[in-house]
Amino acid sequence: MILDAGFLISVDRGERTAQEFLTAALAHDTPLTTTHPVVAQVWRDGARQARLARFLQSVVVVAFDDGPEVGNLLARAGTSDVVDAHLVVVAVQRSEPILTGDIYDLESLTSALPERQPNVFNWP
């Protein structure tokens, strides 16, 4: 499962829904992944984000090294959100669904894909 910023914010705030999701993901051996650009969106002060820092140690954080693929997807979709486009590219590469609070933005990107479209689920 590829995690967008909304979920990481929920973790950072200690929201019960995030904890329940994490418990279920662990019980079902669901791999959790996010990206460095998503982390950059939510990271503000490590001293005040201990919960988020601990969480990030337990997930795969994918580097942003897919610039041409992301740019091509943005061109096809006619949009400009690099972070969202990178999430979609990573989801396709890993064959994993996306969990996001911006379902419509991501669906506009996934619909621009020439082939495999990852599933996109709304959070919360």
Show which residues each predicted segment covers:
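Short, well-structured N-terminal submotif of metal-dependent ribonuclease cores
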Residues: M1-T34, W43-F55, P124
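Alpha-helix capping/helix-boundary segments
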Residues: F7-L8, V38-V39, D66, H86-L87, ...
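Acidic catalytic patch
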Residues: S58-G78, V89
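Acidic, metal-associated active-site segment
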Residues: V42, D81-P97, D105
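Short active-site oxyanion
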Residues: H28-L32, S58-V59, V92-P97
